[in-house]
Amino acid sequence: MEAFSYTLLMALAAVTLFFAVAFRDPPKFDK
């Protein structure tokens, strides 16, 4: 269960970091 918790925490951290960068910088995605 510790492995699942660790993986979930890492996923949450990655998503948080991604959204922090995405919202800090203007979106540069070509629609």
From Swiss-Prot:
InterPro entries linked to this entry: PSII_PsbT, PSII_PsbT_sf
A cellular component term, taken from the record's GO annotations: photosystem II reaction center
Cell compartments where the protein resides: Cellular thylakoid membrane
Keywords: Membrane, Photosynthesis, Photosystem II, Thylakoid, Transmembrane, Transmembrane helix
UniProt main location, coarse: membrane
Presence of the UniProt keyword Thylakoid in the record: yes
GO terms classed as biological process: photosynthesis
One Pfam family of this chain: PsbT
Segments crossing the lipid bilayer: 3-23
Record bears the keyword Glycosyltransferase: no
Membrane disposition: Single-pass membrane protein
Family per similarity comment: Belongs to the PsbT family.
UniProt function note: Found at the monomer-monomer interface of the photosystem II (PS II) dimer, plays a role in assembly and dimerization of PSII. PSII is a light-driven water plastoquinone oxidoreductase, using light energy to abstract electrons from H(2)O, generating a proton gradient subsequently used for ATP formation.
Subunit structure: PSII is composed of 1 copy each of membrane proteins PsbA, PsbB, PsbC, PsbD, PsbE, PsbF, PsbH, PsbI, PsbJ, PsbK, PsbL, PsbM, PsbT, PsbX, PsbY, Psb30/Ycf12, peripheral proteins PsbO, CyanoQ (PsbQ), PsbU, PsbV and a large number of cofactors. It forms dimeric complexes.
Name of protein: Photosystem II reaction center protein T
The organism of origin for this protein: Prochlorococcus marinus (strain MIT 9211)
Organism placement in taxonomy: Bacteria, Bacillati, Cyanobacteriota, Cyanophyceae, Synechococcales
